[in-house]
């Protein structure tokens, strides 16, 4: 067997293995297992050929061993963690497949050059990326014979027509390091071929981007659409092509920055620092590390007018590579990645502190191996949207504990996965709180904040913070748009130091009540007569005192909400409160914006009631009632109380018309009818809500037999409650009765009577 045939078979094996990984994570285990069997079949055939003994023995053996282990793990269902599954499922992008780098053994991974075909073929279907409509260009296959890593040759690379100054600056910064290993890791195989794999870091992993050997060329022009140099050097243009392919717009480049692009090329930790007051960030530390080749540096201009740009020799919205710094004169030498035909902009220029106000960002990429021994990462999906109703406890949260007696520096890097939707609108943030055990933060003011707010619309966000000795923290991720993310953590503690998904402080969570306020039950605050119409719930703590956290979370952005908890008794179970009794309140906090939260310590066995209210009435909006406690699940129950006065309900309204009594005739149609009457006075004609300041007459109500005027229930006490008068009465016989409604003095206004009953009845 010829080597080119062997390489083609190996290429098909690793490609099929990547698809098997993806299918396994997608839940198509049977397909994945079948693909593994196909791989083993091919490898068994290869092992029997002469080629097996000609340098490929270990490669075939390593892939076979890995495939068989992967097959067994599929059967056991334990090959991938949740994070790894999401990472693999993030491989599909713009209809293309970009698998993570797979390590088969300590000597072999999927980027190895022997796992790519070597034959040069004329392809009918080329890897064509979109081109700018304004340019007359075409694609050609190129012979790539110059694979030099020589500094002098690569340092002449430049950007021409394509506006990707960030990428060219990033590649030039690696060249300035003279790190040939970083350059070699960008593309494979390093020989003339039709197919190449480029290794770029995005979507939480080093990923392999397959491209062909076609590049765009302009018709009737000496200008270039690709990265170029004075040499016949094409391999950097292939890496550029892979980079543009991943971003999705091809040669219609839509922008990036040097820090992000350098991260994609090297995995060096990116930091984007705004330049404020013409001062650079921590110059001494940065330049010391720059001299030791531990950081890569760049700088980006802000928006400049055409006149100012020409005058200063700065390009508007442009990234430059930083090549040196003079600590005495505070001058910085920059390298311009762009060369124009008329050479109106210099390739190298020197700036001073006085020029910094023309620049907007300082780009730093830190070599992780120079500053940290260990890295841990987790990939997850953010399904909810901040600023549109998402509350703190619904956001992804992670628990972190410093196990040492010393302060520890930890860096967190949050990566937003491609593709980017509504890029400029999406803000991301990392919030860190000091917590007792790294438990989930329910509301923002519950715990001490350990970092400052620094949200960004960048695809990457770096947060540096110092952990106190033995202190636990909770990391909260915030985003304005749903997306997939990877959170990376760099540390010097140990390989086993990780963060985990945060859990609630208490172990038992009562199923969340998803409810809503409507025009029927949005009663407003307790100073309104409709307060008792709000949604209400029974709480029963059965035998053990319990610690319980209760939260009310609304969908409102700009409305105040609250919940009140009242002491009750067994006889009140299933019945709604009829007045706001402050003496029975467990807590009486002020209304707060969008949510209310309380952490009750040692709530005693007994019966309680919750009333959920917004400060304003007549609102429409959803809310959730969350309860978490530390007692056994069956020790606490929460049930919603039905809002109706009875199974059957009728209403009657009348005007007082300067009188002080009114007779309402009604007929019970069945035996043993249980009636509840709710009498409400209104002083205003077109207003169905009374407030504390409104006049209310004292009223009372009694029930009589309509046939003989015999009293059924006499109520002698007068009542002027804001929430109205309630009368409960059991009527044994089906016949006609009178509800006599009286007020203390004659007057005006109207009275509304709601009647509820467990059996049918009629108002006459």
Curated annotation (Swiss-Prot):
The keyword RNA-binding does not apply. The keyword Cytoplasm does not apply. PROSITE patterns: CALPAIN_CAT. Required for the proteolytic cleavage of the transcription factor RIM101 in response to alkaline ambient pH. Its EC number is 3.4.22.-. GO terms for molecular function: calcium-dependent cysteine-type endopeptidase activity. It holds the Pfam family Calpain_III. This is Calpain-like protease palB/RIM13. Belongs to the peptidase C2 family. PalB/RIM13 subfamily. InterPro entries: Calpain_cysteine_protease, Calpain_domain_III, Calpain_III_sf, PalB/RIM13_Calpain-like, Papain-like_cys_pep_sf, Peptidase_C2_calpain_cat. One of its GO terms (biological process) is proteolysis. Residues 95-368 form the Calpain catalytic domain. The active site is at 165, 318, 336. Keywords: Hydrolase, Protease, Thiol protease.
